[in-house]
Amino acid sequence: MEGWEEVSILAAILYSFPASKDPVTSLLFDSVHNLLWCGDSSGSARSFTPNAGYPFQLYPYTKFPATTSPLPVVQQRNHSRGILSLSQNCVNLNSRRGLSQATFTAASVTDSANVLRNLSCMTTLGTGNDIIVGGTHSLGSLDMQKCVATGFDHSGNLSFVDSVAKTLVLGTTDGTVELFDTASNSSVKSFPAHSGLLSDMAVQGNYIATCGYSARRRYDHKNSSAAGGTSYITDPLVHLIDTRMMKSLSPIPFPNGASFVRFHPKLPNIVIVASSTGVLEFVDIFDQSKLNVYQVNMSPASPGISRMEISDNGEYICCSEGRSLHLWSFTSDTNFVNFPAPLEEQDIPAPLPPPFEVDDPVPLSSVGMPYYKDYLLSNYATDMVFTKELSKVPAEVDTSLGHGAFVPYDRTAHGPRNISQPYQSLREPPGSNSNAPRFISERDGESNENMIHAENSIFHLKSPTSVPHCYSRLQIQYSKFGVDDFDFDYYNKSNGACSGLENHLDNSYTNALLQLYRAAPAFYNSVVESLLPEYLPNGPEIISWNPQGSSLLIELGYLFDMMHKAEGRNVKIANFSQLLTQSASAASAGVINTDEEKSLNADGLREIIIRFNHYLLSELTSNQRERRHTNSEKIEDIMGIKLEMQIKSQCTETETHTGSQLIFDLTSPPEQYLNKLAMLRRAEKTEITILSYMDYFMDQYKSASCRECEARGRPHAVNARQRVVRLPKVLSINLSMTNFELQQIHNCRGWLVPEFHIGEDERFVDAGRGRKYELLGYVCEISHGPGVKRGAHNLVSFVKIKGQWYLFNDFLVMPIAQEEALNLSYSWKKPVIIVYSEPGQDFSYFETSTFKKIQDLDTSIIYRDHFVRAAREGHRQEYKLLTKQEAPEIGTLIAIDAEFVVSEPEQLEIRYTGTRKLIKPKKLTLARVSVLRGNGPNIGVPFIDDYIVWTGHIEDYLTSFSGIEPGDLDPEVSKKALVTLQTVYRKLWLLLNMGCVFVGHGLQNDFRCINLVVPKTQVRDTADLFYLPEFKRKLSLKFLAYVLLKEKVQTGNHDSVEDAYTALMLFQKHEELTRTGDLETVLYQVYMEGQQRRFRAP
């Protein structure tokens, strides 16, 4: 096999979002056409074809989504009808033009064995209508004609699957190769190929070749003892198996570490072996001294070879490296197959006839009209136009009605029967609150009667047939004054005890769950205390996939602390949501929503919040393990449920396994168990509650036959018992139930118990004995109409805080009676996540008086720089860092100003009348922060002047207002010394908790965009200090500086240092006028002069 060389390098994927280390996840040469296929990590399939006139040049042919969700394409296969694509939970069949032919998921086929879940490999068998799929604990067959998935009797995780005649070849994750007979539904033979994992497997004729990893124990050489861990190294041998003789052959040595292996399709005695470092070797399996070695030309920063495939004619080899494809060949022929079929080209539309030009000199009457006798429709008389009132659309049939043979009339859902309902016009749909005050600027024009009527209608809880207004989806309205004019305080009735969360951001469906965990003292303390030690990663690899330089644990800690400091004011989850949206792990977990739940129906909304609950606790636990040790209690200790499994068998000794999980996934018990509870309920007059459900799942018995002894003719049972041995301080319960199962809960009065007690054996006991658990709250889904309707439903939470129950519906917060909170009889009220906790736990809030004395607190970042990369050559530092002698104290004055850029434009609705309505405001991203000393010998000298790195899209730099030029925030080309958002946020957060007083102009907008909540006692805003309410106009910084300081500022591009210094001087002017008693007189003179100059500085 001489003469091979690299003939082409193709950039298959130019950009991937979210960023992935392995964008190309599958490779395939077409068996019919001259096409090279690849799948990527976002679920798209691409094909490339060579041009006959330009050899070795590949051109894009098609690109289309090959999966139902943005999950990686695991594998691709040729099919007579197109290309098969495999993802984690589905199999797609697309034509080579990209048209979808069929999609097979667990929901679309009859899949009683859960075959189509957690898939990792597939192959075809027989005629091609049967697809063999394998994955985690599953091996099955998918009939494409009947849409039926059948499971095989096989256990173990599979990495590869192929076929030899009618026998399947299985490659497992533990390095074993199995021959599986589908006719007898059993394994024929097993070969231990590698002691570690399998990295690749190839089958040709009667031979099987594998490569993989070897497991090695780690040793502590200093103490000459095992360290207790296992590491994996690439195996330097290619394992060969002969299926005719049913034995292993002599392995092929490959010192560079074999990662990929393929048989030559035309020369079955030739094996192609490749390493991740790009070494290619052609070797004869019968004469291993005959070999040819080549090296792939890889880039210096290459992640390594990730895939290798060979064409059907054996003349081309393709290797994937990151986003690039390397094409190798030894011939000038451009065909991947011997007799390629012609490709289907796009249709070319026929040319349109030349247009008839009608301009000012040519009248429209010159076009001509056919002869007619009757009046034209345009001559319709105006008195014959009638407007008919819109009729009421009939309600859709509930899809859950088909689950039972007989469904009685639901009085709670539809009200009493045989009572006429008042007509409701579609022009004024129910739930619209025209009397509710939306804008602060409208307060003066409202009467007290309208205010009382609106309050009664919005916060009224009783509604006989419909959902009360307080549970409806809330929308933030925007006036000409922006979001600051929206009256958030009107919707908060907690008297400052709780803060609502805004819902016009991505992933706002998490608001209900965040409010619930915020009320758990142990959970709150563990998360917030993680902010004390410093965590500021800023390496290049961090910036590429995490430009904020933060973690979910850190952002949640900041969010909880801001919710405490808000004291009833609304809070944004902007930084938390942005980190979640940019996270690759969140995308793979399916917990990202960027359309404000408009694409989710009722089931989808419940599923995504349950998935997020799993993802949140798992990610927080992982983040805490990565951080250095602190004295705070860990999430896994607070919420970890201790489990024990005992396996008893006659042939082996009793085995005991222990483990833990963070969430109790509660489903509906079997029907026979519920029938038993119903009989006990009638006999003993006891209610069916959540404890009845939990009691079934906390101690379960299962049995199965011993396969080994059954094969020897001595069948017996193996009994397994799984039970909960310890419940945590905070118990989180997911209710993964269908609508039909939730209806059973609605019929159980008192299903949600306010408290329960656990004995020493972790079983429920009577009150007064054992450990006590109280209901902290729960998240429920509110259904507005049919469950299949998308974007109509929302999530709320009921939380008990200091003995009082509160309803949290995004930014609506109101107290509620315990009877109403625990009432689950409404058909539209469906619980999703329930949290119980042990009482007697206290919150550890950060107070300014004791903040600096907290153990493990690291404040070093405010005394040093922490750039993303080293300072650029020629960079001039125009600020002076704080020293330990200047350490901030309570009441220390600091002047601050921030600049922003627009990352997303505003969304407008333009009506036919020409009026414009703001649907969603533009999204601002922090670009620069400057902080100056406000007192002391160095007053006015900046000690923070940071530019924040931003790798995303920038819609508008706002250069004339922000002073930010294109490229200033790009770490690759910027001449500024950049820092991460997490770095500058920690500096401001430390200054806030140390008790510093912030001086600035228009700080409300700056703090809102930074997502920083500062108590009013620590804010000195010159826009409010120099403001007279009767004029209803706030003065600009530029105008105040011209009138009061006699200085001209902002003459060019804005400079945040200059603006902060000007605000500091205005504050000193205000203090001076206040001491002399001339403030009101001077302020009136300023407004008078402003009216003469139209409030503009020359």
Swiss-Prot record:
Organism: Meyerozyma guilliermondii (strain ATCC 6260 / CBS 566 / DSM 6381 / JCM 1539 / NBRC 10279 / NRRL Y-324) (Yeast)
Residues of the Exonuclease domain: 894-1067
WD repeat boundaries on the chain: 19-58, 150-190, 253-293, 300-338
GO MF annotations in UniProt: metal ion binding; nucleic acid binding; poly(A)-specific ribonuclease activity
GO biological process, one term: mRNA processing
EC class (word): hydrolase
UniProt-listed SMART domains: EXOIII, WD40
Region (Disordered): 417-442
Compartment(s): Cytoplasm
Regulation: Positively regulated by the regulatory subunit PAN3.
EC number: 3.1.13.4
Function as written in the Swiss-Prot or TrEMBL entry: Catalytic subunit of the poly(A)-nuclease (PAN) deadenylation complex, one of two cytoplasmic mRNA deadenylases involved in mRNA turnover. PAN specifically shortens poly(A) tails of RNA and the activity is stimulated by poly(A)-binding protein PAB1. PAN deadenylation is followed by rapid degradation of the shortened mRNA tails by the CCR4-NOT complex. Deadenylated mRNAs are then degraded by two alternative mechanisms, namely exosome-mediated 3'-5' exonucleolytic degradation, or deadenylation-dependent mRNA decaping and subsequent 5'-3' exonucleolytic degradation by XRN1.
Cofactor: a divalent metal cation
Gene that encodes the chain: PAN2
Residue intervals of the USP domain: 466-839
Family listed: Belongs to the peptidase C19 family. PAN2 subfamily.
Domain of life: Eukaryota
Sections of the chain in a coiled coil: none
Cofactor note: Binds 2 metal cations per subunit in the catalytic exonuclease domain.
Subunit-structure text: Forms a heterotrimer with an asymmetric homodimer of the regulatory subunit PAN3 to form the poly(A)-nuclease (PAN) deadenylation complex.
Catalytic activity as recorded in UniProt: Exonucleolytic cleavage of poly(A) to 5'-AMP
Free-text domain note: Contains a pseudo-UCH domain. This ubiquitin C-terminal hydrolase (UCH)-like or ubiquitin specific protease (USP)-like domain is predicted to be catalytically inactive because it lacks the active site catalytic triad characteristic of thiol proteases, with residues at the equivalent structural positions that are incompatible with catalysis, and it cannot bind ubiquitin. It functions as a structural scaffold for intra- and intermolecular interactions in the complex.
Keywords: Cytoplasm, Exonuclease, Hydrolase, Metal-binding, mRNA processing, Nuclease, Repeat, WD repeat
Binding-site list for a divalent metal cation: 897, 899, 1006, 1059
Name of this chain's protein: PAN2-PAN3 deadenylation complex catalytic subunit PAN2
